């Protein structure tokens, strides 16, 4: 499914409670200085659990990154709809849990947010 970045910008409002998009120069692209979750600038293609300034990753996310998870659309869409289920399946660890408690209800929103992130959050 092809995402719509404009719809993704609107849907990203749901993410701003916990996430920001702040580029390497410190310019805020989206969000309101939230620190609960990692900065999503550079998330496209990034190994899971490796955003340098964020220290709050759970063990399940770190394990997924160690097992090779790099964020692409397919994995992002699955993860944001049910983080704990995704991490259990990806890592093969029945005890893995996602620290992200929010679940995005609509798959279309997930595709749209990914399209938005591809537009504004990719490192040049």
Curated annotation (Swiss-Prot):
- Post-translational modification, briefly? Binds 1 heme c group covalently per subunit.
Q: Which residues form a coiled coil?
A: none
One Gene Ontology term of the molecular function aspect: heme binding
- One Gene Ontology cellular component annotation? periplasmic space
Positions where Pyrrolidone carboxylic acid occurs in the chain? 1
Matching InterPro entries, A to Z?
Answer: Cyt_c-like_dom, Cyt_c-like_dom_sf, Cyt_c_1A/1B
The UniProt keyword set, sorted, is: Electron transport, Heme, Iron, Metal-binding, Periplasm, Photosynthesis, Pyrrolidone carboxylic acid, Transport
Q: Where does heme c bind?
A: 15, 18-19, 100
Could you tell me the Gene Ontology terms of the biological process aspect for this record? photosynthesis
| Localization (cell) | Periplasm
In terms of Gene3D superfamilies, this protein maps to:
Cytochrome c-like domain
The Swiss-Prot or TrEMBL record describes its family as follows: Belongs to the cytochrome c family.
- PANTHER family linked: CYTOCHROME C (PTHR11961)
Functionally, this protein is described as follows:
Cytochrome c2 is found mainly in purple, non-sulfur, photosynthetic bacteria where it functions as the electron donor to the oxidized bacteriochlorophyll in the photophosphorylation pathway. However, it may also have a role in the respiratory chain and is found in some non-photosynthetic bacteria.
Q: What is this protein called in UniProt?
A: Cytochrome c2
Gene giving rise to this polypeptide: cycA
């Amino acid at each position: 499914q092809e995402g719509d970045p404009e719809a993704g910008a609107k849907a990203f409002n749901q993410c701003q409670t916990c996430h920001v998009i702040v580029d390497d120069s410190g310019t805020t692209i989206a969000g309101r200085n939230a620190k609960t979750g990692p900065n999503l600038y550079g998330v496209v293609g990034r190994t899971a659990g490796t955003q340098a300034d964020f220290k709050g990753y759970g063990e399940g996310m770190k394990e997924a990154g160690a097992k090779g998870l790099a964020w692409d659309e397919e994995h992002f869409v699955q993860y944001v709809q049910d983080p704990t289920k995704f991490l259990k399946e990806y890592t093969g660890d029945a005890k893995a849990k996602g620290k992200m408690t929010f679940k995005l209800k609509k798959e279309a929103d997930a595709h749209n947010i990914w399209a938005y992130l591809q537009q504004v959050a990719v490192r040049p």
